[in-house]
Amino acid sequence: MSGHSKWSTIKFKKALKDAKRGKIFTRLIREITVAARAGGGDPASNSRLRLALDKAYGANMTKDTIERAIKRGTGELEGVDYEEVTYEGYGPGGVAILIETMTDNKVRTVAEVRHIFSKRGGNMGTAGSVAYQFKKLGLIVFPADADEDRILEAALEAGAEDVVNEGERIAVYTAPSDLHSVVLALEAAGLKPEESEMTMIPENTIEVSGEEAEKLLRLIDFLEENDDVQNVYANYDISDEEMARLEATS
Protein backbone atom coordinates (compact mmCIF):
# COMPACT_ATOMS: atom_id res chain seq x y z
CA MET A 1 0.00 0.00 0.00
CA SER A 2 2.71 2.46 0.94
CA GLY A 3 4.06 4.58 -1.87
CA HIS A 4 0.84 4.86 -3.88
CA SER A 5 0.11 8.33 -5.21
CA LYS A 6 -2.91 9.91 -3.59
CA TRP A 7 -4.47 9.90 -7.05
CA SER A 8 -4.08 6.15 -7.45
CA THR A 9 -5.94 5.35 -4.24
CA ILE A 10 -8.71 7.89 -4.52
CA LYS A 11 -12.24 6.59 -4.42
CA PHE A 12 -14.65 8.66 -6.45
CA LYS A 13 -17.59 9.36 -4.19
CA LYS A 14 -20.64 10.87 -5.70
CA ALA A 15 -21.83 12.18 -2.36
CA LEU A 16 -18.75 14.33 -1.96
CA LYS A 17 -18.81 15.67 -5.52
CA ASP A 18 -22.51 16.33 -6.00
CA ALA A 19 -23.28 20.02 -5.77
CA LYS A 20 -26.75 19.55 -4.34
CA ARG A 21 -27.31 18.48 -0.75
CA GLY A 22 -30.37 16.51 -1.84
CA LYS A 23 -28.26 14.17 -3.94
CA ILE A 24 -25.98 13.50 -1.00
CA PHE A 25 -28.96 12.54 1.11
CA THR A 26 -30.43 10.33 -1.62
CA ARG A 27 -27.31 8.19 -1.72
CA LEU A 28 -26.99 8.02 2.03
CA ILE A 29 -30.64 7.02 2.41
CA ARG A 30 -30.19 4.24 -0.15
CA GLU A 31 -27.16 2.93 1.69
CA ILE A 32 -28.97 2.97 5.05
CA THR A 33 -32.00 1.21 3.57
CA VAL A 34 -29.97 -1.49 1.82
CA ALA A 35 -27.74 -2.01 4.87
CA ALA A 36 -30.77 -2.43 7.13
CA ARG A 37 -32.38 -4.84 4.67
CA ALA A 38 -29.22 -6.94 4.49
CA GLY A 39 -28.29 -7.06 8.17
CA GLY A 40 -31.19 -5.77 10.25
CA GLY A 41 -32.00 -2.42 11.80
CA ASP A 42 -29.74 -2.61 14.86
CA PRO A 43 -26.41 -0.84 14.24
CA ALA A 44 -24.89 -2.63 17.23
CA SER A 45 -25.03 -5.91 15.31
CA ASN A 46 -24.88 -4.51 11.76
CA SER A 47 -21.48 -2.96 11.01
CA ARG A 48 -22.50 -1.82 7.54
CA LEU A 49 -25.48 0.05 8.93
CA ARG A 50 -23.26 1.55 11.62
CA LEU A 51 -20.93 2.99 8.97
CA ALA A 52 -23.87 4.33 6.96
CA LEU A 53 -25.28 6.04 10.04
CA ASP A 54 -21.92 7.64 10.81
CA LYS A 55 -21.91 9.17 7.32
CA ALA A 56 -25.51 10.31 7.66
CA TYR A 57 -24.94 12.03 10.99
CA GLY A 58 -21.78 13.59 9.56
CA ALA A 59 -23.89 15.07 6.76
CA ASN A 60 -26.36 16.46 9.33
CA MET A 61 -29.20 14.19 8.27
CA THR A 62 -32.10 14.38 10.71
CA LYS A 63 -32.84 11.51 13.08
CA ASP A 64 -36.36 11.21 11.66
CA THR A 65 -35.05 10.78 8.10
CA ILE A 66 -32.56 8.17 9.27
CA GLU A 67 -35.20 6.21 11.19
CA ARG A 68 -37.53 6.15 8.17
CA ALA A 69 -34.71 4.86 5.97
CA ILE A 70 -33.97 2.07 8.46
CA LYS A 71 -37.66 1.12 8.66
CA ARG A 72 -37.91 0.96 4.87
CA GLY A 73 -34.99 -1.46 4.94
CA THR A 74 -36.48 -3.67 7.66
CA GLY A 75 -39.90 -3.64 6.00
CA GLU A 76 -41.68 -1.62 8.69
CA LEU A 77 -42.37 1.05 6.07
CA GLU A 78 -43.04 0.56 2.37
CA GLY A 79 -40.24 1.66 0.08
CA VAL A 80 -38.36 1.08 -3.16
CA ASP A 81 -36.58 -2.28 -3.39
CA TYR A 82 -33.01 -1.41 -4.37
CA GLU A 83 -30.61 -4.07 -5.61
CA GLU A 84 -26.84 -3.81 -5.43
CA VAL A 85 -25.16 -4.46 -8.77
CA THR A 86 -21.50 -4.04 -9.66
CA TYR A 87 -20.40 -3.33 -13.23
CA GLU A 88 -16.89 -3.61 -14.63
CA GLY A 89 -15.04 -2.19 -17.59
CA TYR A 90 -11.96 -0.53 -19.00
CA GLY A 91 -11.29 3.12 -19.71
CA PRO A 92 -8.73 4.93 -21.87
CA GLY A 93 -5.21 3.61 -21.35
CA GLY A 94 -6.51 0.21 -20.28
CA VAL A 95 -7.47 1.50 -16.83
CA ALA A 96 -9.72 -0.92 -14.92
CA ILE A 97 -12.95 0.60 -13.62
CA LEU A 98 -15.30 -0.87 -11.02
CA ILE A 99 -18.76 0.68 -10.61
CA GLU A 100 -21.00 -0.01 -7.61
CA THR A 101 -24.68 0.78 -8.11
CA MET A 102 -27.96 0.59 -6.21
CA THR A 103 -30.85 0.28 -8.61
CA ASP A 104 -34.55 -0.50 -8.78
CA ASN A 105 -34.22 -1.36 -12.49
CA LYS A 106 -31.17 -3.35 -13.60
CA VAL A 107 -32.15 -3.20 -17.27
CA ARG A 108 -32.12 0.60 -17.21
CA THR A 109 -28.90 0.85 -15.22
CA VAL A 110 -26.84 -1.57 -17.30
CA ALA A 111 -27.98 0.17 -20.50
CA GLU A 112 -26.99 3.58 -19.14
CA VAL A 113 -23.60 2.40 -17.87
CA ARG A 114 -22.85 0.65 -21.17
CA HIS A 115 -23.82 3.79 -23.07
CA ILE A 116 -21.43 5.92 -20.99
CA PHE A 117 -18.56 3.51 -21.61
CA SER A 118 -19.16 3.37 -25.36
CA LYS A 119 -19.54 7.14 -25.76
CA ARG A 120 -16.53 8.06 -23.59
CA GLY A 121 -13.76 5.86 -24.93
CA GLY A 122 -14.21 2.85 -22.68
CA ASN A 123 -15.42 -0.72 -22.93
CA MET A 124 -17.84 -2.42 -20.58
CA GLY A 125 -16.56 -5.79 -19.43
CA THR A 126 -18.09 -9.01 -18.20
CA ALA A 127 -18.47 -9.97 -14.54
CA GLY A 128 -15.06 -10.74 -13.06
CA SER A 129 -13.06 -9.02 -15.79
CA VAL A 130 -11.94 -6.22 -13.48
CA ALA A 131 -12.88 -7.06 -9.88
CA TYR A 132 -9.83 -9.28 -9.31
CA GLN A 133 -7.61 -6.20 -9.73
CA PHE A 134 -9.03 -4.60 -6.57
CA LYS A 135 -8.89 -5.50 -2.89
CA LYS A 136 -11.65 -4.68 -0.42
CA LEU A 137 -10.36 -2.88 2.67
CA GLY A 138 -11.61 -0.76 5.52
CA LEU A 139 -10.55 2.88 5.21
CA ILE A 140 -10.24 5.42 8.03
CA VAL A 141 -9.39 8.99 7.03
CA PHE A 142 -7.68 11.74 9.02
CA PRO A 143 -6.82 15.27 7.85
CA ALA A 144 -3.29 15.84 6.55
CA ASP A 145 -2.32 17.92 9.59
CA ALA A 146 -3.28 15.23 12.12
CA ASP A 147 -0.62 13.67 14.36
CA GLU A 148 0.68 10.96 12.04
CA ASP A 149 2.94 9.32 14.63
CA ARG A 150 0.09 8.93 17.12
CA ILE A 151 -2.21 7.60 14.42
CA LEU A 152 0.42 5.11 13.25
CA GLU A 153 1.08 3.81 16.74
CA ALA A 154 -2.57 3.51 17.76
CA ALA A 155 -3.72 2.06 14.44
CA LEU A 156 -1.08 -0.65 14.20
CA GLU A 157 -1.59 -1.58 17.83
CA ALA A 158 -5.31 -1.98 17.09
CA GLY A 159 -4.62 -4.32 14.16
CA ALA A 160 -4.65 -1.98 11.14
CA GLU A 161 -2.88 -3.23 8.01
CA ASP A 162 -1.24 0.03 6.98
CA VAL A 163 -1.09 3.77 7.56
CA VAL A 164 -0.31 5.94 4.54
CA ASN A 165 0.30 9.68 4.28
CA GLU A 166 -1.34 10.42 0.93
CA GLY A 167 -0.55 14.12 0.89
CA GLU A 168 -4.05 15.49 1.30
CA ARG A 169 -5.01 13.00 3.99
CA ILE A 170 -3.69 10.30 6.30
CA ALA A 171 -5.30 6.97 5.46
CA VAL A 172 -5.53 3.97 7.76
CA TYR A 173 -6.29 0.68 6.01
CA THR A 174 -7.76 -2.35 7.78
CA ALA A 175 -9.16 -5.77 6.99
CA PRO A 176 -12.90 -5.32 6.35
CA SER A 177 -13.81 -7.21 9.53
CA ASP A 178 -11.49 -5.04 11.65
CA LEU A 179 -12.71 -1.62 10.54
CA HIS A 180 -15.08 -0.92 13.43
CA SER A 181 -12.71 -2.14 16.14
CA VAL A 182 -9.85 -0.02 14.78
CA VAL A 183 -12.09 3.06 14.64
CA LEU A 184 -13.09 2.50 18.27
CA ALA A 185 -9.44 2.06 19.30
CA LEU A 186 -8.41 5.27 17.54
CA GLU A 187 -11.26 7.20 19.14
CA ALA A 188 -10.33 5.78 22.55
CA ALA A 189 -6.82 7.14 21.97
CA GLY A 190 -8.29 10.61 21.39
CA LEU A 191 -7.99 10.44 17.60
CA LYS A 192 -11.26 11.31 15.85
CA PRO A 193 -11.32 10.32 12.16
CA GLU A 194 -13.06 12.41 9.51
CA GLU A 195 -14.54 9.36 7.84
CA SER A 196 -14.57 5.57 7.90
CA GLU A 197 -15.90 3.24 5.22
CA MET A 198 -15.32 0.19 3.08
CA THR A 199 -13.37 0.83 -0.09
CA MET A 200 -11.74 -0.97 -3.02
CA ILE A 201 -8.01 -0.44 -3.51
CA PRO A 202 -6.24 -1.34 -6.77
CA GLU A 203 -3.61 -4.07 -6.53
CA ASN A 204 -1.60 -2.29 -9.25
CA THR A 205 -1.95 1.04 -11.02
CA ILE A 206 -1.53 2.29 -14.58
CA GLU A 207 0.01 5.70 -15.14
CA VAL A 208 -1.90 7.91 -17.54
CA SER A 209 -1.27 11.42 -18.80
CA GLY A 210 -2.20 13.88 -21.51
CA GLU A 211 -5.25 13.15 -23.64
CA GLU A 212 -5.69 9.69 -22.13
CA ALA A 213 -5.91 11.17 -18.64
CA GLU A 214 -8.40 13.81 -19.77
CA LYS A 215 -10.64 11.22 -21.44
CA LEU A 216 -10.42 8.91 -18.44
CA LEU A 217 -11.43 11.58 -15.94
CA ARG A 218 -14.27 12.64 -18.21
CA LEU A 219 -15.51 9.05 -18.40
CA ILE A 220 -15.42 8.74 -14.62
CA ASP A 221 -17.26 12.04 -14.23
CA PHE A 222 -20.09 10.80 -16.47
CA LEU A 223 -20.31 7.53 -14.54
CA GLU A 224 -20.49 9.46 -11.27
CA GLU A 225 -23.32 11.62 -12.60
CA ASN A 226 -25.58 8.60 -13.12
CA ASP A 227 -28.26 8.54 -10.43
CA ASP A 228 -27.87 4.81 -9.75
CA VAL A 229 -24.10 4.90 -9.27
CA GLN A 230 -22.88 4.92 -5.69
CA ASN A 231 -19.10 4.49 -6.08
CA VAL A 232 -16.55 4.37 -8.88
CA TYR A 233 -13.07 2.92 -8.43
CA ALA A 234 -10.27 3.00 -11.00
CA ASN A 235 -6.69 1.71 -10.96
CA TYR A 236 -5.01 4.72 -12.54
CA ASP A 237 -2.15 6.90 -11.36
CA ILE A 238 -1.73 10.53 -12.42
CA SER A 239 1.34 12.44 -11.27
CA ASP A 240 0.88 15.58 -9.20
CA GLU A 241 2.39 17.64 -12.02
CA GLU A 242 0.02 16.18 -14.60
CA MET A 243 -2.98 16.63 -12.34
CA ALA A 244 -2.04 20.27 -11.78
CA ARG A 245 -1.83 20.74 -15.55
CA LEU A 246 -5.22 19.13 -16.07
CA GLU A 247 -6.82 21.27 -13.38
CA ALA A 248 -5.31 24.42 -14.89
CA THR A 249 -6.73 23.64 -18.33
CA SER A 250 -10.14 22.40 -17.21
Curated annotation (Swiss-Prot):
Protein localization: Cytoplasm
SUPFAM superfamilies in alphabetical order: YebC-like
A GO MF term: DNA binding
Xref: InterPro entries: Integrase-like_N, TACO1_YebC-like_2nd/3rd_dom, TACO1_YebC_N, Transcrip_reg_TACO1-like, Transcrip_reg_TACO1-like_dom3, YebC-like
The UniProt record lists the keyword Transit peptide: no
UniProt record, GO biological process: regulation of DNA-templated transcription
Family membership: Belongs to the TACO1 family.
HAMAP family for the chain: Transcrip_reg_TACO1
Protein name: Probable transcriptional regulatory protein AFE_0059
Origin species: Acidithiobacillus ferrooxidans (strain ATCC 23270 / DSM 14882 / CIP 104768 / NCIMB 8455)
Taxonomic lineage from the root: Bacteria, Pseudomonadati, Pseudomonadota, Acidithiobacillia, Acidithiobacillales
